[in-house]
Amino acid sequence: MQFIDEVKIHVQSGHGGAGCVSFRREKFIPFGGPNGGDGGRGGDVIFRVDSNLSTLLDLRYRPHLKAGSGKNGMGKDRHGAGGEDLVIPVPPGTIIKDAETGEILADLVTAGEEIVLLKGGRGGQGNARFATSTNRAPKFAQPGEPEEQRWLRLELKLLADVGLLGFPNVGKSSFITRVSAARPKIADYPFTTLKPNLGVVPYKNYRSFVIADIPGIIEGASEGAGLGHRFLKHVERTTVLLHVLDLSWMPDRDPIREYEALNRELALFSPELADKRQIVVVNKMDLPAVRENLPAVLPWFRERGLAVFPLSAATGEGISPLLDEIARSLWGKDEEEW
């Protein structure tokens, strides 16, 4: 399924039905009193979180959505039926903004959560409502209230506990495949990952956490280079970031310089994102070159108080200590301390 995380839509609530002008016309009562019914209320526009959805794809092809209008009132004091509400299902993590001002109108994260964003117009009152002692045969009724309408921008920010960051081809997709049931495309060329992937990582004592793998970030991403910058929003809700490094390219590529470059891109995108706790992961420990190069970079990270976890996504070496560290970051303790 195509991953769509931004759409612009126009929504409109229902118009209220008009009140009715009507009089009793019965045998032997040629000039009966007013009996016009009220118009029905217009339908509301409601956004509801559906945990079965993971993309805004459906809304991309339905940019104009409208609730049902209320029916007009009728004679014999019959009220018009209310218009059908427009219920728009969205995935967890959807942010709804005013398309013109950028104002955040709702941030929907919990399954079943809903918000009435536009109210339908009230139905007009029929002439039976206006009968008085001085005007027993009112020949007027209220029109229904008009609908509300608005252009909206919907943005999806995936809900994950852990964000997976790194330059292209450092083995992020291999890692998420190793620790979860997610199966992203894996190949030996840059930008194999073209969309965010979520994986549920089973931990101990029946606990688990969600990890998000986004396309690789490259230097200059904040100016539009590469693919990853537009997906950085999907790790904004995370608690901890895993920064994956590949030492197999040394000395042609400097992993410390790449680490600093990626963090500059984070800061340009969001200072809050750059301040999140990071765990440094050195992947591909199954390669002799990585084992040889590791001692050259460890002191730099340790001097800065950064935890470094060498591992191999290919063989599983070093995975368990990393998962324990993630557990401490998320819950304050690992399995041994429960």
UniProtKB/Swiss-Prot annotation:
Listed InterPro entries: G_OBG, GTP-bd, GTP-bd_Obg/CgtA, GTP1-OBG_CS, GTP1_OBG_dom, GTP1_OBG_dom_sf, OBG_GTPase, P-loop_NTPase
Biological processes annotated in GO: ribosome biogenesis
Domain OBG-type G: 160-331
Ranges that cross the membrane: none
Needed cofactors: Mg(2+)
Residues that bind GTP: 166-173, 191-195, 213-216, 283-286, 312-314
Keyword field contains Metal-binding: yes
Intracellular or extracellular location(s): Cytoplasm
Entry's family note: Belongs to the TRAFAC class OBG-HflX-like GTPase superfamily. OBG GTPase family.
Quaternary structure and interacting proteins, as annotated: Monomer.
PANTHER family xref list: DEVELOPMENTALLY REGULATED GTP-BINDING PROTEIN-RELATED (PTHR11702), MITOCHONDRIAL RIBOSOME-ASSOCIATED GTPASE 2 (PTHR11702:SF31)
Protein role: An essential GTPase which binds GTP, GDP and possibly (p)ppGpp with moderate affinity, with high nucleotide exchange rates and a fairly low GTP hydrolysis rate. Plays a role in control of the cell cycle, stress response, ribosome biogenesis and in those bacteria that undergo differentiation, in morphogenesis control.
Name this protein carries in UniProt: GTPase Obg
Organism: Geobacter sulfurreducens (strain ATCC 51573 / DSM 12127 / PCA)
Chain's gene name: obg
